[in-house]
Every structure is written in C-alpha cells, then in structure tokens.
From Swiss-Prot:
It is a multi-pass membrane protein. InterPro entries: ATP_synth_F0_asu, ATP_synth_F0_asu_AS, ATP_synth_F0_asu_bact/mt, F0_ATP_A_sf. Gene3D superfamilies: ATP synthase, F0 complex, subunit A (1.20.120.220). SUPFAM superfamilies: F1F0 ATP synthase subunit A. NCBIfam families: ATP_synt_6_or_A. The keyword DNA damage does not apply. This is ATP synthase subunit a. Disulfide bonds: none annotated. GO terms for cellular component: mitochondrial inner membrane; proton-transporting ATP synthase complex. Keywords: ATP synthesis, CF(0), Hydrogen ion transport, Ion transport, Membrane, Mitochondrion, Mitochondrion inner membrane, Transmembrane, Transmembrane helix, Transport. Pfam families: ATP-synt_A.
Amino acid sequence: MNLNSIFGQFSPDYFLLMPMTLASMLMAISWLFFSNSTNWLPTRIGFSFLTFNQTIIKTIFQQTNPSSITWVPIITTVFILLFSVNVLGLLPYAFTATSHISLTYSIGIPIWMSVNILGFYLSFNSRLSHLVPQGTPSFLLPLMVIIETLSLFAQPIALGLRLAANLTAGHLLIYLMSTAIWVLMNNVAIASITLIIFILLFLLEIGVACIQAYVFTALIHFYLVQNL
C-alpha cells in the first residue's frame, strides 16, 4: 500500500503472501461461531469461548459482593472489546483504536460516572465520608477534602490515559525495531539479533495488550466495589 497516495487504501495489502482483506474476512466470520447455537450441547468452539468467558469473570470478580453481579455482563463485554481491539491492533496495517484517548475516555468516563452516581445515590453520607480519611486532624480537613476530590476526578483520566499510553509506547517500540531491522539488513549478524529481539518484543506486546485490558476492567470493578 502506498501511504502517500490518497487511493492507496484501496490497494490490496499482503502479509506473508496472504491478502490482509481475506484474513480480515476470515477473522470476522469466525465470530459467527461464538453465536448462540440451537444444539443441546455446545460445540468445541462454543465450549472454548464459554470457558474463556468464565475464566474472565472468575479473574476479574475475585473479590466482589452480590450487589455487583448485575455489572458482570457490562464489565465482561468491555474486557472482550478491549482485548480484541488491542490484539488485532498488532496486525500489520491495522488501526489500534485503543491507542487513542478519544476511545479510552469514551469508554472509561461514562462507566466511571455511572458507578459514582450510583454510589452517591445508594449511600450519600458514606461516599462523602471517603473524602476525609479516618483520624485526620481537624486543621487538615479542608485540605484533605480538596485532595481526595482531585484524586477522585483523576481516576477516569488515569484510567483512559494508562491504556492509550502503554499501547502507543509498545507500537512505537515495534516500529523503531522493525525500522532498525530494515536499515541493518546488509549486516546479517546484527539484523538477525535485532530480529530475535523484535520477535520477543512482539510477544511482550501481545502480553501487554492482554494485561492492559485486564487492568482497565479490574479498576472499573474496584471503583464499583468502592461505591456499593
């Protein structure tokens, strides 16, 4: 694809002799196997997805209370969405939407606001008491209220910024490493060592993509437990 051409986005892209359009279509069609089936027993793919979903729920909701059970579908959906976008963004010529704060804030801020509004609605006095830590001297009360209020409003900012910053840093490292491999192609020894480092870095970024999706949803669950 010619990145300097306006119509370059319509030209077919190839990765390891495989058309990227075909790979994207196969990946999209694969989600059909995760839809509800009319069979009495689930298929192997459906059972695998069900096991994966149950593992996510057990991992995120290790310490919870019965009041947060209704939030399980929402938080699980957010995790699967972030996990899919993060991992698919590592494909060549793929756009990683979660590396932009416009998307991460669009997901994090509404959920954070709804969780805190619910907390103030259910127990207004209890939520106000969190602004003043127990044992605070009287002369520090106004200052602690300001600090705790600022830290409360910093939660959604850090929530979205952490995800976008980690993915952006990882993509920059992959880009710089791949550029170094291309420049050092004439020197086989150095290029081979750089390629090995690049493969290890790519595997690390796959882990980062999974971990960041977990951290995002785990923090949402933590904020939820604080407000219930």
